[in-house]
Amino acid sequence: MGFGGAFIHSRTGLVTEYMSEEWLDDVKFAAEKLHENGLEAYLYDEDRWPSGTCGGYVTQEKCFRAKYMTYKEITEEYEKPENFIGLFAVIFNGLSVKEYRKISSPADKKQDERVFVFYYDYMQPDSFYNGYTYADTMNLQATERFIELTHEKYYKAFGNLFGAVIKGIFTDEPHRNPYLNGFGKKGKNPKK
């Protein structure tokens, strides 16, 4: 059993700027050397993992960042969140929602109701994403931007190598929230 090729993949600790001219030259050199030695070359389309951010370049634009819906209970007048979805009056039966209705103001709640404001928020920046966040993979424009900054940039730099020298591009785990973004931590879920 032997090795038939390699994936050219950036990893934690990369010194060369990801997708820079130097990076592209290095990738081209590695692919050509693999080919000269009878090995297949494949590219990985991300700086570390998961695929979708182009090393944070995609999510420099806030509209392309991963977002999630969240809520908080309010007991009095409140400042409407920037990404407001709705205000709801809720009656619970233990931990289960018995009834709910959309309301306009906390003053609209009845005696046995609790009031919750729902809104969406963006994933917090993280050093793993070079100071940015994961991408909103449900946003077509974010995905198109990722392809433009990664796949198309590789093709523009050395498209003549695709097929014969570079056999393909590997993409990895295009979704991993909520498991690695605080899901289930104290303060993130309702107490009741």
Where is each model-derived feature located?
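Mature extracytoplasmic enzyme cores
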Residues: 1, 19-192
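N-terminal cofactor/phosphate-binding cores enriched in small/glycine residues
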Residues: 1-11, 15
